[in-house]
């Protein structure tokens, strides 16, 4: 079932990285990574006009697979903010990452995705880099929003009973 979700996500989401991962229960999950440069202006949590096509397509996908559970995680690079201490910058990055994750989730909810599908919406700040923060390219990769689609308890039960569509 998650294979279908992954295939459709790859077809519908331009400029997003779609991967199959294993969730905490050892089940397949689909991880969709959006470069935050595609979604937001620098230092902003307001969605850009360009991001809305991708998010509209994601909303359609999530409504189609309405039994999927969803987590959204915001991430930033480790760059400091002007006139801020390292500690203040880390706090601002954490807040920004949380606001970005919430912006994505609120947009999806406004486009018909059920609130009950969202399980975790978390800002990680710069705590989980995927690339080197000493280069521009690396920092860009670290500024991202990750959306995980995974089997809800309902889907797991249906799969075990053989009733999952």
Specify the residue positions occupied by each region the protein language model found.
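Periplasmic OmpA-like peptidoglycan-binding domain that tethers envelope proteins to the cell wall
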Residues: 76-158
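Periplasmic peptidoglycan-binding/tethering modules of Gram-negative envelope proteins
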Residues: 1-69, 150-165
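Short connector loops/turns at beta-strand edges and beta->alpha or beta->beta junctions
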Residues: 35-37, 75-78
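Conserved hydrophobic/aromatic pocket- or pore-lining residues that grip, position, or stack substrates
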Residues: 55, 72, 121
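A short amphipathic beta-strand at an alpha->beta junction
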Residues: 66-74, 80-81
């Amino acid at each position: 079932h998650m294979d279908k979700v992954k295939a459709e996500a790859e077809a519908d989401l331009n400029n997003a990285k779609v991967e199959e991962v294993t969730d905490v229960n050892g089940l397949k999950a689909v991880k969709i990574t959006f470069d935050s440069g595609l979604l937001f202006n620098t230092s902003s949590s307001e969605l850009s006009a360009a991001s809305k096509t991708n998010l509209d397509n994601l909303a359609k996908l999530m409504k189609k697979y309405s039994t999927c559970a969803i987590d959204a995680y915001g991430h930033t690079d480790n760059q400091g903010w002007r006139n801020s201490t390292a500690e203040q910058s880390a706090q601002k990055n954490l807040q920004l990452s949380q606001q970005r994750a919430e912006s994505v989730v609120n947009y999806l909810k406004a486009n018909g995705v059920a609130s009950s599908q969202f399980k975790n919406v978390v800002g990680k700040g710069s705590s989980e880099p995927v690339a080197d923060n000493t280069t521009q390219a690396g920092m860009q990769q670290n500024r991202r929003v990750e959306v995980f689609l995974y089997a809800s308890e309902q889907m797991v039960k249906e799969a075990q009973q053989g009733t999952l569509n």
